[in-house]
Amino acid sequence: MIHGVLNVYKEKGYTSHDVVAKLRGIVKQKKIGHTGPLDPDAEGVLPVSFGKATKLCDLLTDKDKTYQAVLLLGQVTDTQDTSGQVLEKHSTEDLTNEKVENVIRSFEGEYDQIPPMYSALKVNGKKLYELAREGKEVERKARRITIHEIRILEINLPEVKLEVTCSKGTYIRTLCHDIGQKLGCGGCMKELLRTRVERFGLEDSIRLGEIAQLQKEGILEEKIIAIDEMFPTYAQVVLPPKTAAAVRNGNSFRKRDISQETALKEYENDERVRVYDESHQFIAIYCYCRKDDLFKIVKMFFDGNEKK
């Protein structure tokens, strides 16, 4: 079984679930999960976790993301992108590049974004897009998100090409809609390309066809990033056999329990570390609590089927 993360390039026309289903067929492995959905009409970086790395999905979903998007001004749709039904059309003749730039840049920083009806968020156990398809609209709570940076790549009205770096939970479709509303002419998203999720960029992403070929040649695992390599900034902690056995059961441990080779480091409060046994088998991610002088479990990656 493969354990690790693969940087997949999701092509247009596929849902993120479609990508996972196709990968299961390619590698003949069920335990696969993606780390944050992309709309079917969007494309770009989609990190996919295999085997024990599926425990990473929530950790990767929390990471900042970067997108390139094309904003179409003068048009409002029910889906907030050009795939939806047009609800309004307005002239953009009075817009100037300067006004557009100023309004777009005003969205940098934190703002309360209302999720779109056409989204996978659930209300009372039902997905919003299912309600939307039934012609229903329900009240959605605004969510505080952060737009770290917006770069305006090109203005060719009524279209504007943007690069957006943002926090988790940000809907670029909704950002486009909100920019249009603030400009007074409406707007929607025409194109979306996700260019980065944390360490994963377009430059090393792999399309499904290439993945199938690599698997056929028996070299796909060369492209898989090992679980512990996903945390390159975390210090490594090596444990002697007795402590390692306890840690495999999720027990906490103290600094004095660490093998000599990694015991000399001073650990900050709440610092996360990668925990290994003396054969350098990766076990878990732990966090140091200075008050108790204890390392406490964050995420376990060892399972009982592995050799100890």
Where are these regions (language model features)?
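Catalytic cores of RNA-modifying enzymes
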Residues: 1-167, 177-206
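Accessory RNA 3′-end/elbow-binding domains used by RNA modification enzymes
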Residues: 1-12, 17-38, 42-45, 98, ...
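Conserved glycine(s) of the Walker
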Residues: 171
